[in-house]
Amino acid sequence: MYQILTNLTEQISNASGFAHLAILILAMIIGLFLLTKGGDWLSDHSSHMAEALGVPNVVIGLTIISIATSAPELFTSIAAIRGQAEGLILGNIIGSNIANISLILGLVLLIKPIDTKGAISNNQILILLLLTISFCCVLFFNPTQTLSFGTGIALFGFISFYLCWITTRALKKRNSDVSDQGSDLKDVESSNPLTFSAFVVFLSAVALWIGSDFLVFGAKNLASLAGVPEELIGFTILAIGTSLPELATSISLVRKAKNDMLLGNIVGSNLFNIGLVGGVAGILGPVNSQTPHPWIDYLSLVLITALFCYWLKGRKLDKKEGMFLLAIYLAASSCTWIWNG
């Protein structure tokens, strides 16, 4: 798909510079649409399957929905490596994690306040903070600012262990509560068969694959046309685009008052962006930072994550915190554009 788009654009660009720009923008719009719809389908139907199996809400948010909403970042990173646009990857991972907390949670808090008390365990909070700091430190203290094969293996190994650990805990809880949920599971299965959900999950994966090719193709060539680093495009346009499934999911969850699932989705999504997406990218890479001052992005991510983890310790969040988070996102984006643009 990526090669077909490249050949088509080369033919059009020879005839008209405007047509070249138009097709790049159109490719990004199509890519964002497919990624958003694919992420929505994957999130909705994978969470349905988990609920039908009796998995608790917070665990669904930390695992199933988090993996589903991180799928656009994963597919985009793989497409970026295939399309030799590795500069998009680090910007996308860091930018998406910043957007998940400051932009998405900020917008959600403008809709409805959230009480974080008891929503996320201290273990999950500590894991998120330590993984974020470790990821940024490894990149910062590496002279070449490279996400290497060894780092990729370590990240992938960690996220695999984390997934096994939290799944084991969920299965133990389900077994202890299965007698109370038996009748509910029948109702869920009859209203929306698991086989149909599994089929939609497959279709969503196809949409994510095609959408990621379109988005990476448009972003890479647009960065080249504008003369800005690919990583900067990844930090902003790609990060917001691939975070749209998280935004749609979060708005839906806050309206249903599923705060534990919402916060679990943000925590889990950030964990999987670093562990799964970063791990796979490092294994398939290596991935090099292409910005002159990448430490700005690392520092922004660590500070924003630390603030989020502090707030998860039982604070009630409302519009004031929402406005503050949005201001932080604008400040972080402005700094990276000024220093790295």
Could you say what each language-model-derived stretch is?
Residues 1-341:
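Hydrophobic alpha-helical segments, chiefly the membrane-spanning helices
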